[in-house]
Amino acid sequence: MEYNLNNAISYHYGKFPPTNLQISDFLPELLAATDALARFDQMLKNIPNNEILLAPLRNQEAVLSSRIEGTLSTMDEIMAYQADDEGQVKASSQVRTDVIETILYQRALKNAQQALADGYPFSISFIKQMHQQLLFLGRGASKSPGKFKEEQNFLADKIRKEVLFIPISPEKLGDGLDNLFQYIEKSKDAVLIKTALTHVEFEALHPFNDGNGRIGRMLITLLLWKEGLLSQPHFYISGYFEEHREEYIQAMRLVSKENSWEQWIRFFLKAVEEQAKNNLSIAESIRSLYEKLKLEFAAKLSSKWSMNALDFLFTYPVFRNNKFTQNAGIPAPSAATLSKKLIELGYLAEKEAASGSRPALLSFEPLMELVRV
């Protein structure tokens, strides 16, 4: 059955970047988004060990950004995989493909952040490297990782067999990407405006056969950090996009259909504001839990190693019991005693019982209950 093209919207040739935008038109939304983002960033700067907040937020972002594209994994699955991960992502008959793809999202984003920190510029080779890492394994491995499309692609409603959007043609893609990266390098637009336009333009170019949405959302975090709006590359926006998926897609389509850059920018600024507030709320909840349990652990564990245990659990809330013994910075006999006591007190739940030489898989439920999505 062929796809229906009657309602298809085509790429906006010759209209990027828009030339008639007035920042005054977006000033209230821009100020609100900037303020919310600054509050979140300031809180992270004020916490000595902010990894206890960032690790759960990173996992949420990977799960939700992948979920927008139809890759369904859970926080528990991701963290269980990480508990057995020795630094290499490997395909396994014991692990669902969706989990592998979500883990690869995390790795690609982390490596991209490091590349930018090392002085690598936003460029064609940069996004190709990101894409190659994103689609290294799983279903994407058969979709030309690191290579641009050579045939016309399109976005479609597969149930109704309707084409919704036709991205830029392969023949024009090189010029489109050059134009985008020149804009990123030279534009004097406000950072949030630049980020909004970069994201929607990348989505409209749709340069790869698969993984475009995930790469496009990574660019948001990377740009906000690289352009100086964030002190660290740790702002994750996919939660809002996933919750408002139809509005997100429609706002992007209207850019090409009606040249409606303004509507897209307003949607994006609202997304940043609301997601920053939500991230701040989650981080505050995690910090409050940490402070509460600091007192409880000191009182109930009666051990000089209680803070070591707490920091480990917040950083690795799902783990094999032997990793706690090896990596919490606690002498092995004391670690074994603390682990047993934490289970007895109900802080740790056994997700998998020990079997042979394989240690038990444990979950730090007070934190997991806050961050599951």
State where each predicted segment sits.
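FIC/Doc superfamily catalytic core
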Residues: 1-373
